[in-house]
């Protein structure tokens, strides 16, 4: 499947070392002012080569819109866009054409398709997420007009964890450090860890926390159309994700029911709200009007700049030595991707309701 969404739909295309990455957005309402500076700014957050913590692949990632825009506004027709690939070093992958790299998609793609583009991971590369960020930026622009804001940040790298709740951190600090952690002291520790593993030719994983603020009551459907399930599906479609939980999540197993229920009361404005939000803003698969917050776990990058044993397509055991340019940790560049997938999911359900 290369299409995401039911009403607000994105179909992405392209491979890591192909001519370009792009997409077609269907179902976008007409009359939306397309803030190009904002859209490009979102792309710049996931762009490679932005700091010493990311791959040195030097791509400008400038988006070109091909259709669906007139006089700076959407016109309700399919929005086509493209981002050209300009800095491929495909020769770095010549020796890997017949090799199954550990914990990559090489083996499964070979078994499923037999013929595929192995360069830079081809279609399985995180470069595909360019299309998601463009579509997510447009979704954000629409949601902002509805009072809905999506914010994500790095809350853990390896064993370095930001233990504070999202309500205790200053979101304005997120873009102040290369690792996109809002706690500046914890961020320094995260950066030091990433630099340390990079020097050893190794990699490290972590967790991104995301908050959807201002989501109205009623988004989502019972049983198989749950908003929580849709968010999980969206997040687990991102490269290198290995886990998703929302609200108190897995930590809830340590609580008793009397410690985990969100009690209702009427606030000073006469609105029914809850005293806590252990449920993460979703009850019965339907948004409750409270903040929706969740966490996404990312594995360490599978490409290591150190030798590993593997096999080739004929089953011969070989010592794998990898070249190329790779992230020691995907977390900093994955923040805008998580936000984009959340924005598209929330907007898709919003358009269904309204």
UniProtKB/Swiss-Prot annotation:
It holds the Pfam family Chorismate_synt. GO terms for cellular component: cytosol. Its cofactor is FMNH2. NADP(+) binds at residue 46. The keyword Amino-acid biosynthesis applies. CDD domains: Chorismate_synthase. It is an enzyme of class 4 (lyase). Gene3D superfamilies: Chorismate synthase AroC (3.60.150.10). Pathway: Metabolic intermediate biosynthesis; chorismate biosynthesis; chorismate from D-erythrose 4-phosphate and phosphoenolpyruvate: step 7/7. FMN binds at residues 123-125, 239-240, 284, 299-303, 325. It comes from the Bacteria. InterPro entries: Chorismate_synth, Chorismate_synth_AroC_sf, Chorismate_synthase_CS. The keyword tRNA processing does not apply. SUPFAM superfamilies: Chorismate synthase, AroC. One of its GO terms (molecular function) is FMN binding. Keywords: Amino-acid biosynthesis, Aromatic amino acid biosynthesis, FAD, Flavoprotein, FMN, Lyase, NADP. Reduced FMN (FMNH(2)). It catalyses: 5-O-(1-carboxyvinyl)-3-phosphoshikimate = chorismate + phosphate. HAMAP family: Chorismate_synth. Homotetramer. This reaction introduces a second double bond into the aromatic ring system. PANTHER family: CHORISMATE SYNTHASE. Belongs to the chorismate synthase family. This is Chorismate synthase.
